[in-house]
């Protein structure tokens, strides 16, 4: 073997070597050479033989060593014998198929006659051949098993006679050659055989009894079987029996396995046309016919009946109310209404209608309505209610801010549910209730999902939900969200246990639906419960889970339970959120308000439910819900419902816990078991709640009401009364929802002090409060609870437990894919953009920074993290889900109050605050965004009705947010616009419907404003907001725009301080809760009406502050917030954007205007920053109002720009680039620098020439704006570019940039470096960091990199400084950079105010920088300057407390954050 070993590897080489060496070594011995050669050859062949033998037998182990020749030969002989024996056996049995391991012999050929039957027998389908004409040439006999047709019936018939119409095209593609059918799916070469697999629906032969029926009936009864066809097209060369089979399609059709069956669309829809009187003129059900879902005729019939029927407690039917809305707004979404089919299937429906006008005369001609239906199908009815698509659109308005809505749009049942909830509030229109639910539910924004996820978490299904929508429910983002998660538990328990109509499977589906479904499930279950208050009561008594589930019957109790239950660690906020979420689900549908709906809603939020029952909008929803649910409940039996509630509630209870949420979240069924783990505590909680409920509702009358509700009597009102009623059930005054609303608001305000109390205290107190207050009050209380708890959570009253819950939630979020799906969603975004630790740290920081603003500050921080993330995502959702759904926002406005009180405070405390003055409605709208999202939605929904709830809603929100106060009022008006901001075009229509007062500017603000900015604005802008509460809805829309509107929202200051008090003296979380409560109470009283707000503003000197220092304040806050936001979340743009907007806003006394201005100016910035989310395009929100001013400003700016065309072009280009390619940096920083430098020189010359003139103009305009107040500023704020922005979200930025750039030029003139900065802004658009460095002014002003950071944050800020285009940014950078320099600081302040004023006028902005230096120095500048440095020094401020006096600090913070960002 030695020879073999030596040479086998390369015998040829060995032989050559041997020839050369042999003569020398061995001598001339031919014999020896021959022997060696033979040996080598022998070794070689044996080795090859070994390889063949062992390789053939896959005896790989034998390759590890070299076998000896004997072994190899032995194995070879053995194998040859085996082969011969096998051949003999095969010869004996010719028909026997050869063994697979025998490869040496030829394949056995099966006789063709035997092969056919064998194949057919083995086939899992039938075989058919279709020729080029589409005729069936052959079909196998077994077709009868599948289609009931005989072979003879199909032979030589057209295949299209049995194919569904919708599949003809696909079949033709497969039948005809690629050359004939363009875009054919064949991928193989034409001459080769091609195979393809496709699905098609084939007609099943009708049964004999149906053949006699008429054609129509027969068509209706047609049944199609979805078959999977494997088709092979034969090449031309194949001919058989003279027949050309070249174009034949040979197919094998088999039934699609259940697991492979495509998921049927979760929603169905049909369209109707109505005349202007609302009478149906035509009905189109073709889409439902094509869907082939059984019972669609009954579905259409019952939907129309439900929509047009007048329900108890309602003055008009859904159809009538909706028709009026359509005629008024041009586009409207109805509230979600529910009904049941003849088979008991629950259906959630929503109608979207559009007014069609004549193209020539523009006169209304008719109304086209799309009715979207979602069947329950063993899932929580809420899911059907939500009908991913059906609810999605309506929800979109609300949901536009909320991932839940997005989910809904996506059509996930779970998500649908959540969306449904959201919509309910906007649709329900109970301002308080709706807004609140929105706030809580939508307030969740991302939280919405959180609540959905977390709420669903309790339900086994719900957790599955969570898997789908973790980002939605990012709990970390919203400490209050954890409550939301708990709330889902509530839902879960009703869904799983409490809803006879909706069996656990329902919940399971809900769970699978996703977190939103969880919410929906909750609602669905709630419905079950709602039908009987008694059941709900019992459920509550039986367990927290039930309380959540049965919270339908007693939302308040549910809240209480959540709070009481172990889940309460974080649950107090979660409870609130959950309660809201649960209610939201129902609220969305609005039906819960009635009967089952009432209970469901009540379970979610007592107050809210009441609101639903309120005459506003909820009644309709509630009645529907009550109808559908009551039917289900009645059909299944109250007893069963009660049993479900009692039994499942225990299981579900644990789910409220954060851990339970996480666990349940992980598996949809897990929720039940998870809740089971918490069963003991939940039982205790249940008993406590029941005890309290009994105590609170000690009167037999209350119990009787509950019983009546349980029995389905007076369900709507009673359920709402009982629903809040576990605790407040009895006390609820179902009869007077409005009164309750006010009472609830009052109660919330009065109980505001609990807000600051530690979470543990708050939970019981809130619970108690809930029980004590009226149903409306309960709802408010719940909202308050949420907010208070959230507040306390934010401040870190219970950092340990809250953090634990938060961590769990964050884990869930991080583990789920939702964050990826909804990176922008509040919950998801926080999880995605900021790691869990960062969020927790922020939360801790908030608690640690218990500065006067702590409640707000903490909230802000949390919001900054969660809301900013949420906000950004939400706008994205809004844009994606509800781009054209301004109407939904309007709908949302109907229930602004609901949102107001929501936890959003903690979630997006700034947002929350904003909605407060605006109304809960605002929050309702902004709710999705977080609080802001809810607010926004609520505002939109309640915009029109908002006057009715203003003070009440404000009060609750104010108390809840504590900082919101009057300022939010105007915000609320604007939320509609903000809500529409997602869909700028739609936004504008929306705005009219909400409130004339609402600033379109606001929308613009909303669009531009990022969560961070919103938060930042909480400080200074608060005043502005408050100053213009009536008109200044703009700030709310900002909030609503979860986009990067934080900055804008910050303008409002609302988010920051609900009350002027907060603004003036930062609402210190440090202050005792009682003090804060007292302040809130006072604020509530003061803000009860707009006059009071205005008086307060005047007393506080807010108008002056707003015009002067506030502008700066907002900027500072904006910068800080922006910085924080940037630090916390990936998108730097929001910060930059926010900071700039904030400055502008801050300077503008009117928040709207500043917001608008910021939007206008910032749009380019926003665009730059918004690259990651071009959908935000805040400028698109700018409305027509400011058009004149904007146009004037634009003309001025353009005139100036004409001198500097290059710069202007660049700015425009940058904006355009951002818009077109948001992800791509606009231009290289170097280019921007070069341009900036050149333009700086040119512009400096022009500016110096015009400097004095421009400054004078700017000053005059600033004064004018201040004098005019916020009303004027919005129009002014909206530059000409802005209006364009409003109309076209993408263009707006370019327009805004256009406008801002002229100001930039002006600013450029002012400071040389600044001007470079102006060019730089263009560069920052492309490369903010470059912009900073490029802008000498910026760098100079901020000698330290910190300033550059603001510049980075305000990448444009420098540019703005250079060119007043972005006053807010410019001024904030100055402040931040030169916080120490009082002159600069002053300059910045003036700049800010001027910026806001010149927001609409670029030229003014240009001068602003210069003028600012001179005039702004006067008031806030010096103060701000000093403040700025101080705050900058305080890292805590950076973290969470960005208050009015922190503007410079904010800038500094921005600088720090930006610098870090820049230089990292």
From Swiss-Prot:
A motif (LLXXLXXXL motif) lies at residues 1079-1087. Residues 638-648 have a biased composition (Low complexity). Residues 26-83 form the bHLH domain. Residues 1-11, 468-486, 657-681, 992-1003, 1022-1034 have a biased composition (Polar residues). Residues 624-637, 1453-1464 have a biased composition (Basic and acidic residues). There is a cross-link at residues 239, 648, 705, 731, 785, 1454 (Glycyl lysine isopeptide (Lys-Gly) (interchain with G-Cter in SUMO2)). Present in a complex containing NCOA3, IKKA, IKKB, IKBKG and CREBBP. Present in a complex containing CARM1 and EP300/P300. Interacts (via C-terminus) with CREBBP. Interacts (via LXXLL 1, 2 and 3 motifs) with RORA (via AF-2 motif). Interacts (via LXXLL 1, 2 and 3 motifs) with RORC (via AF-2 motif). Interacts with APEX1. Interacts with BMAL1. Interacts with CARM1. Interacts with CASP8AP2. Interacts with CLOCK. Interacts with DDX5. Interacts with ESR1. Interacts with HIF1A. Interacts with NCOA1. Interacts with NR4A1/Nur77. Interacts with NR4A3; potentiates the activity of the NR4A3. This is Nuclear receptor coactivator 2. It comes from Homo sapiens (Human). The lineage of its organism: Eukaryota, Metazoa, Chordata, Craniata, Vertebrata.
């Amino acid at each position: 073997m030695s020879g073999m070993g030596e040479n086998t590897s390369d015998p040829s080489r060995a032989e050559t070597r041997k020839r050369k060496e042999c003569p020398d070594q061995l001598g001339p011995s031919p014999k020896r050479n021959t022997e060696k050669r033979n040996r080598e050859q022998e070794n070689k062949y044996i080795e090859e033989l070994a390889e063949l033998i062992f390789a053939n037998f896959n005896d790989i182990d034998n390759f590890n060593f070299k076998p000896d020749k004997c072994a190899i030969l032995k194995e070879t002989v053995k194998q040859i014998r085996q082969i011969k024996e096998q051949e003999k056996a095969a010869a004996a049995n010719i028909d026997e198929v050869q063994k697979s391991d025998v490869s040496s012999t030829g394949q056995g050929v099966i006789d063709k006659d035997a092969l056919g039957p064998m194949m057919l027998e083995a086939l899992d389908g039938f075989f058919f051949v279709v020729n080029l004409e589409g005729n069936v040439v052959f079909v196998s006999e077994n077709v009868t098993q599948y289609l009931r047709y005989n072979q003879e019936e199909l032979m030589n018939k057209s295949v299209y006679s049995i194919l569904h119409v919708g599949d003809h095209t696909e079949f033709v593609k497969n039948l005809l050659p690629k050359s004939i059918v363009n875009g054919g799916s064949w991928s193989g070469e034409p001459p080769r055989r091609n195979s393809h697999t496709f699905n098609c629906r084939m007609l099943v032969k009708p049964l004999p009894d149906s053949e006699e029926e008429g054609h129509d009936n027969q068509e209706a009864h047609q049944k199609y079987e979805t078959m999977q066809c494997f088709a092979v097209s034969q090449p031309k060369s194949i001919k058989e029996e003279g027949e050309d089979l070249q174009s034949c399609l040979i197919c094998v059709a088999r039934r699609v396995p259940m697991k492979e069956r495509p998921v049927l669309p979760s929603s169905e829809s049909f369209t109707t046309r109505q005349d202007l009187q609302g009478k149906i003129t035509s009905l189109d059900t073709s889409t439902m016919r094509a869907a082939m879902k059984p019972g669609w005729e009954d579905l259409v019939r019952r939907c129309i009946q439900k929509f047009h029927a007048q329900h108890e407690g309602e003055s008009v039917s859904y159809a009538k109310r909706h028709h009026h809305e359509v005629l008024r707004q041009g586009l409207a979404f109805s509230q979600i209404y529910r009904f049941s089919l003849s088979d008991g299937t629950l259906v959630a429906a929503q109608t979207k209608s559009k007014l069609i006008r004549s193209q020539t005369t523009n006169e209304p001609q008719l109304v086209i309505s799309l009715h979207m239906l979602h069947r329950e199908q063993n899932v929580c009815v809420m899911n059907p209610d939500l009908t991913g698509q059906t609810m999605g659109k309506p929800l979109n308005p609300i949901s536009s801010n909320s991932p839940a809505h997005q989910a809904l749009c996506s059509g996930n049942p779970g998500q649908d549910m959540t969306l449904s909830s959201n919509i309910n509030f906007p649709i329900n229109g109970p301002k308080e209730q709706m807004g609140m639910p929105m706030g809580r539910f939508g307030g969740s924004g991302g939280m919405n999902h959180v609540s959905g996820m977390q709420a669903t978490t309790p339900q086994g299904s719900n957790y599955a939900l969570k898997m789908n929508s973790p980002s939605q429910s990012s709990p970390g983002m919203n400490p209050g969200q954890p409550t939301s998660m708990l709330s889902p538990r509530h839902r879960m328990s009703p869904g799983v246990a409490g809803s006879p109509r909706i069996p656990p499977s329902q919940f399971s589906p809900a769970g699978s639906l996703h977190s939103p479904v969880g919410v929906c499930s909750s609602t669905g279950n709630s419905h079950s419960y709602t039908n009987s208050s008694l059941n709900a009561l019992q459920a509550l008594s039986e367990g927290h889970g039930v309380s959540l589930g049965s919270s339908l019957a007693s939302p308040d109790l549910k809240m209480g339970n959540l709070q009481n239950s172990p889940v309460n660690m974080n649950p107090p906020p979660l409870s609130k959120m959950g309660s809201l979420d649960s209610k939201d689900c129902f609220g969305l549908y609005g039906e819960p308000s009635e009967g089952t709906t009432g209970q469901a809603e009540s379970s979610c939020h007592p107050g809210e439910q009441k609101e639903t029952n309120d005459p506003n909008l909820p009644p309709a929803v509630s009645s529907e819900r009550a109808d559908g649910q009551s039917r289900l409940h009645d059909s299944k039996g109250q007893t069963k419902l009660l049993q479900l509630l009692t039994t499942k509630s225990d299981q579900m209870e644990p789910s409220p816990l954060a851990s339970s949420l996480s666990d349940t979240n992980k598996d949809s069924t897990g929720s039940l078991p998870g809740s089971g783990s918490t069963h003991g505590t939940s039982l205790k909680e249940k008993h406590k709640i029941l005890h309290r409920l009994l105590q609170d509702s000690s009167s037999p009358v209350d119990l009787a009401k509950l019983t009546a509700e349980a029995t389905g009597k007076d369900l709507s009102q009673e359920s709402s009364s009982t629903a809040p009623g576990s605790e407040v059930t009895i006390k609820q005054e179902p009869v007077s929802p409005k009164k309750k609303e006010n009472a609830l608001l009052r109660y919330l305000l009065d109980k505001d002090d609990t807000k600051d109390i530690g979470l543990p205290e708050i939970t019981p107190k809130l619970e108690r409060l809930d029980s004590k207050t009226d149903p409306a009050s309960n709802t408010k209380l719940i909202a308050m609870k949420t907010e208070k708890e959230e507040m306390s959570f934010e401040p870190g009253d219970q950092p340990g437990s809250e953090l634990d819950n938060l961590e769990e939630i964050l884990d869930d979020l991080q583990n789920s894919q939702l964050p990826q799906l909804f990176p922008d969603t509040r919950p998801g975004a926080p999880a995605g953009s900021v790691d869990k630790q960062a969020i927790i740290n922020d939360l801790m920081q908030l608690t640690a920074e218990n500065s006067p603003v702590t409640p707000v500050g903490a909230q802000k921080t949390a919001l900054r993290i969660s809301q900013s993330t949420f906000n950004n995502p939400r706008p994205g959702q809004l844009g994606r889900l509800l781009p054209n759904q301004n109407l939904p926002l309007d709908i949302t406005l109907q229930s602004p109050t609901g949102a107001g009180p929501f936890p959003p405070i903690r979630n997006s405390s700034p947002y929350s605050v904003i909605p407060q003055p605006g109304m809960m409605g605002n929050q309702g709208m902004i709710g999705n965004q977080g609080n802001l999202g809810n607010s926004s939605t609520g505002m939109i929904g309640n915009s029109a009705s908002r006057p009715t709830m203003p003070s009440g809603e404000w009060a609750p929100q104010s108390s809840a947010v504590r900082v919101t106060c009057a300022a939010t009022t105007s915000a609320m008006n604007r939320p509609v616009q903000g809500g529409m901001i997602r869909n700028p075009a739609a936004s504008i229509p929306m705005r009219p419907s909400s409130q004339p007062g609402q600033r379109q500017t606001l929308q613009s603000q909303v669009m531009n404003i990022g969560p961070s900015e919103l938060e930042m604005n909480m400080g200074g802008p608060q005043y502005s907001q408050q100053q213009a509460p009536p008109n200044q809805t703009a700030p709310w829309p900002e909030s609503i725009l979860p986009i990067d509107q934080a900055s804008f929202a910050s303008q409002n200051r609302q988010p920051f301080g609900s009350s002027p008090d907060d603004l003036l003296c930062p609402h210190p979380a440090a202050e005792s809760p009682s003090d804060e409560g007292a302040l809130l109470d006072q604020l509530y009283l003061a803000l009860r009406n707009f006059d009071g707000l205005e008086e307060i503003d005047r007393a506080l000197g807010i108008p002056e502050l707003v015009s002067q220092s506030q502008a700066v304040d907002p900027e500072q806050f904006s910068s800080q917030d922006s910085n924080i936001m940037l630090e916390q979340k990936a998108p730097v743009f929001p910060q930059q954007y926010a900071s700039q907007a904030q400055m502008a806003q801050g300077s503008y006394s009117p928040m709207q205007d500043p917001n608008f201005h910021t939007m206008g100016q910032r749009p380019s910035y926003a665009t730059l920053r918004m690259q990651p989310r071009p959908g935000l395009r805040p400028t698109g929100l700018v409305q027509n109002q400011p058009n004149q001013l904007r146009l004037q400003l634009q003309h001025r700016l353009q005139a100036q720009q004409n001198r500097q065309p290059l710069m202007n072009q660049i700015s425009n280009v940058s904006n355009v680039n951002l818009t077109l390619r948001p992800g791509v940096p606009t231009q290289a920083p170097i280019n921007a620098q070069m341009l900036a430098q050149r333009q700086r020189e040119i512009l400096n010359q022009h500016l110096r020439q015009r400097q004095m003139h421009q400054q004078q103009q700017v000053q005059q305009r600033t004064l004018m704006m201040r004098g005019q107040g916020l009303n004027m500023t919005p129009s002014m704020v909206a530059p000409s570019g802005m209006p364009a922005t409003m109309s076209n979200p993408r263009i707006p930025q370019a327009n805004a940039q256009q406008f801002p750039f002229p100001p930039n030029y002006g600013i450029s003139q002012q400071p040389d470096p600044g001007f470079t900065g102006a060019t730089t802004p263009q560069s920052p658009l492309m490369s903010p960091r470059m912009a900073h460095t490029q802008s000498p002014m910026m760098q100079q002003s901020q000698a330290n990199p910190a300033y550059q950071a603001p510049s980075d944050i305000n990448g444009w800020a420098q540019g703005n400084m250079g060119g007043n285009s972005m006053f807010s940014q410019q001024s904030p950078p100055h402040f931040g950079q030169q916080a120490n320099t009082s002159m600069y600081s002053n300059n910045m302040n003036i700049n800010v105010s001027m910026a806001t004023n010149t927001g609409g006028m670029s030229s003014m902005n240009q001068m602003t920088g210069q003028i600012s230096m001179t005039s702004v120095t006067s008031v806030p500048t010096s103060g701000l300057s000093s403040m700025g440095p101080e705050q900058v020094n305080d890292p805590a401020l950076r973290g969470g407390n960005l208050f009015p006096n922190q503007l410079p600090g904010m800038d500094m913070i921005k600088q720090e954050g930006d610098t870090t960002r820049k230089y990292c």
